[in-house]
Amino acid sequence: MKTLIKYNLLLVSLIFCFTPTQEVKSQDFGADVASSYVWRGTQFGTGPHVQPWMELGAGNLTGGIWGSFALDATRNASDNELDLWVSYDFGPLALTVTNYSFPGADGTYSAGGVFDGDIEVSGSTSLGPVDLTVGYFTDLEALYIEAGFPIGPVGVAVGYGSDGAGAFYAGGDSGLVNVSFSGEKDIKITEDYSLPVFGSFIYNPDAEAAFLVFGFSL
């Protein structure tokens, strides 16, 4: 199953590469710089990270690359992450397959390669004001369910993790792993440019860990 998903990801990537330019409806790229990298209630690495991304879209199909790299690469080389993903929007439901990989400081892999990462299949939908996401890692047998909703200008997310094959979200068990409160605003730099900034307070009840993250987008 994992091998099949990897080949499908590679196939979709090749389709995007050889699709005529006029058929690619959208493309975008950018980067975030964050004081630390916290994902689903768990901190990955220490210190600030730069997180570039690129994506292409053709109709309801979208594919992209997302990365996270420690700014101090010599000290935190193991913190690097490079993810490939493809998503199809069916209207009320979007399905996404993501390949998570972890290259070294020089971009190479100690085992396998960029297509030999951990595979997650996820679905997302909206139920009124609530955004619901369910993700499942096929080899790790780890399940994550998150509900996100606004309270005024504040974005709130509540995430539940359940581990199967080993410790991942909740130390080999299951529980509430992510309660976060986020906000964002634009800081005016010039008449024509404002810098988007964001901040999040993240609490992991299962691990009894708390984080405060600040960042900006380019």
Language-model segments: which ranges?
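Cleavable N-terminal export/targeting peptides
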Residues: 1-28
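Short loop/turn motifs that connect adjacent beta-strands in outer-membrane beta-barrel proteins
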Residues: 23-26, 60, 92, 126-129, ...
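Short glycine/proline- and aromatic-enriched beta-strand/turn motifs that initiate or cap beta-hairpins
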Residues: 24-72, 134
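Transmembrane beta-strands of outer-membrane beta-barrel proteins
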Residues: 30-34, 55, 64-68, 87, ...
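Residues that define the transmembrane beta-barrel architecture of outer-membrane proteins
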Residues: 46-50, 78-82, 115-121, 139-145, ...
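Surface-exposed loop and membrane-interface regions of Gram-negative outer-membrane beta-barrel proteins
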Residues: 63-89, 95-113
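Detector for outer-membrane/organellar transmembrane beta-barrel domains
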Residues: 109-166, 171-174
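Outer-membrane beta-barrel "beta-signal"
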Residues: 125, 149, 181-183, 187, ...
